[in-house]
Amino acid sequence: MDIWQACTGAEQIIPLRGRLVRLVENQGQVATLQLVDTLEEQALLEQLLETSKPPLPDAEKSLHYLLRTPFRYPPLRWGSRFGRRHEPSLFYGACRLETAMAEAAFYRFVLWSGMLEPPPSGRILSKHSSFEVRYRVQRGVRLQLPPFDQHREALTHRSDYRTTQRLGSAMRGAGVEAFEYPSARCPEGGVNVALFAPAAFSEKQPRNLQPWLCETTADYVAFKSAQTPDTPRLFGLELYLVDGRLPQPA
């Protein structure tokens, strides 16, 4: 199915602006600290690791690392919802924190399902950070609105990305800089955002960084604020099952 052609996509391109939320796992320096004895050794190790990473284009060097990192690495082995394996990576976020958490919870379940054996404790504890950043482009698309909404089933397919990857390639070829689309994971019908290039950011620093604690088990994923006494936000496995099984990204 060619959604872009069916919806006369070139005629749907509009200026787009907004604020997105992204949730990321804290790894990096915490991981390297476990490999050395002193902070001085860690600093040296971080420098060595930096030289082994893909080089940054000049236009990205002024961006905060949370904004530039997603563009720096190749896609996963299955690509992404709107990106093929051979294409540059996109920056994905959500319009609301709850939607970002629902998306992140799915990938925590994918992580759990990929383990040969679950941990003895029956859970995985991890630290995450949420942040906000504004975007503004002249060439944007809203896939959650007509005429694209008639293809919602394909846009939100739980495991088959072939149609959306074809759409992503078509948008990229048409010069689209950013787009919004319906979330496939959010039970409240949230909206996600994707940026094709760093030029879509209207600021170079993230806003409103918030720390979160995450608990992953075989049955649920929970996020809780690491700063305030807050009720955990729970996402049950049943939200993501298709015919009784957890679909794998493909």
Can you name each region flagged by the protein language model?
Residues 1-84, 109-250:
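Active-site and NAD+-binding cores of ADP-ribose-processing enzymes
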Residues 99-105:
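Contiguous mid-protein beta-loop-alpha structural module that forms a pocket-lining wall or clamp
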